[in-house]
Amino acid sequence: MEINHLEKINSKVVSYGAKLLPVVKNRTNDEIKFLYDFGFREFAENRLEDFKQHKEVYGDVNYHFIAPIQSRKLSEISQNFTYIHTISRVKEVDILGSLERNCHYLIQVNIDND
């Protein structure tokens, strides 16, 4: 992505009081560095393994987890991510309630019974 294009998009989004959240899954190190150098300090990731590689390079970034969660990985995810966007089951809420973590959670609620 060209920097001018990104600047225009980001400026428009910010003018509405929102912010862009780059999803870095399947991105190369050069692409992530471009976003980091642009000034982004929050990235979204959907794989714990990929996050670990990114965290080594970009340790001052807040990370958002954006994939369905496996209960057995929930503790590790909550330790490493600032936000979890994909809480969708009561079991996950119960597990998170038993953990003492400083993580923000976004809960998906299905109101259509799908």
Language-model segment annotations:
Residues 1-114:
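Conserved alpha/beta-domain cores
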